[in-house]
Curated annotation (Swiss-Prot):
Domain of life: Archaea
Reactions accelerated catalytically: heme b + (2E,6E)-farnesyl diphosphate + H2O = Fe(II)-heme o + diphosphate
Family of this protein: Belongs to the UbiA prenyltransferase family. Protoheme IX farnesyltransferase subfamily.
Protein name: Protoheme IX farnesyltransferase 1
UniProt EC number: 2.5.1.141
CDD domains found in the cross-reference section: PT_UbiA_Cox10 (cd13957)
Membrane topology, record value: Multi-pass membrane protein
Lineage, highest ranks first: Archaea, Methanobacteriati, Thermoplasmatota, Thermoplasmata, Thermoplasmatales
Organism in which the protein naturally occurs: Picrophilus torridus (strain ATCC 700027 / DSM 9790 / JCM 10055 / NBRC 100828 / KAW 2/3)
Length: 298
């Protein structure tokens, strides 16, 4: 009984270590990428969709595992992260590293088995960008690290699409950039609240390096670019007027919160923007999925 309990606790620790609150969204946007690529519910397409789902899940978990391994010293300093499984000692450094490596390699391997070579390339690029470019090279060196690191968070859309089809379309790339512009808004608005933590850990996040005013303007500019790439699919003819209407309604609070943040840069204003924009990407992709499924059924 004790062994079973210890085993379950260890599994739970590794699951928390993988940061499911982060990778579930990556898996979701990858799933939408796959759904957009299909025009029927044929069995082989559903199988490829499941392959993309598994690949994006294991790849995202692996990437989070490796970035957490790289950030272990920083996480042990920051109040917000010191109780995570690795800095708290729930899992070993060796176990954490192997967890990340095995899942990352598996995510590429499963795509290669099914001969999804372009999707495998995108998976490799996403992992390389997240683990090496963002976490290892840039995170502790520049406040703009999240911009280049944003590529990795957007790759699941392309992986989802190109696992299911080889057909070229602009829509997955538009959604790719939509995700890219959402990431700085999401990360920087939260970092504004915890900038003292980042300062103590020696991480030059944008809110740590720049003034309140410049930080607020930068975050708000990213918010406007996010809205722009949200409406582009309509003007390119990918979705109907209903999509545009919903996006415009969802975007109004972003504009209001962004303007208020610029007028009065405070932690409260930053968190309002963070709390509202956090589910924004999920809403947009969910709308896209519903519209496309309706089109397939027709």
């Amino acid at each position: 009984m004790n062994k079973a309990y210890m085993y379950m606790n260890k599994l739970r620790a590794y699951f928390i270590y993988s940061k499911p609150q982060v990778w579930w969204l990556l898996v979701f946007i990858g799933l939408i990428g796959s759904i957009l690529a299909i025009n029927s519910f044929k069995s082989y397409l559903i199988i490829l969709l499941l392959v993309a789902l598994v690949a994006n899940m294991t790849g995202s978990m692996g990437a989070e595992g490796l970035t957490n391994y790289i950030d272990r010293d920083m996480d042990s300093i920051m109040e917000r992260t010191r109780n995570r499984p690795l800095p708290s000692g729930e899992i070993s450094e060796k176990g954490a590293f192997l967890f990340g490596i095995i899942l990352s390699l598996f995510s590429i391997f499963i795509l290669l088995i099914f001969k999804r070579y372009l999707a495998a390339l995108f998976m490799f690029l996403g992992l390389f960008d997240n683990v090496f470019i963002y976490s290892y090279l840039l995170k502790r060196r520049t406040p703009y690290s999240i911009i280049l690191g944003g590529f990795s968070g957007a790759f699941p859309v392309l992986i989802g699409w190109y696992t299911v089809t080889d057909r070229f379309s602009w829509i997955p790339f538009i959604l790719f950039f939509l995700v890219m512009f959402w990431i700085p808004v999401h990360v920087w608005s939260l970092a504004y609240k915890y900038r003292d933590d980042y300062y103590r850990a020696g991480v030059p996040m944008l809110p740590v390096v720049y003034s309140d005013r410049k930080t607020a303007v930068s975050i708000s500019l990213s918010s406007m670019l996010l809205i722009l790439f949200s409406v582009i699919p309509y003007f390119l003819g990918f979705f109907n007027y209903l999509y545009l209407l919903v996006i415009l309604i969802l975007s109004v609070p972003i504009v209001i919160y962004s303007v208020n943040f610029i007028k009065k840069p405070t932690k409260k204003a930053s968190m309002r923007l963070f709390i509202y924009t956090a589910p924004y990407l999920t809403f947009v992709f969910f709308i896209v999925m519903i519209i496309h499924i309706i089109e397939i059924i027709k």
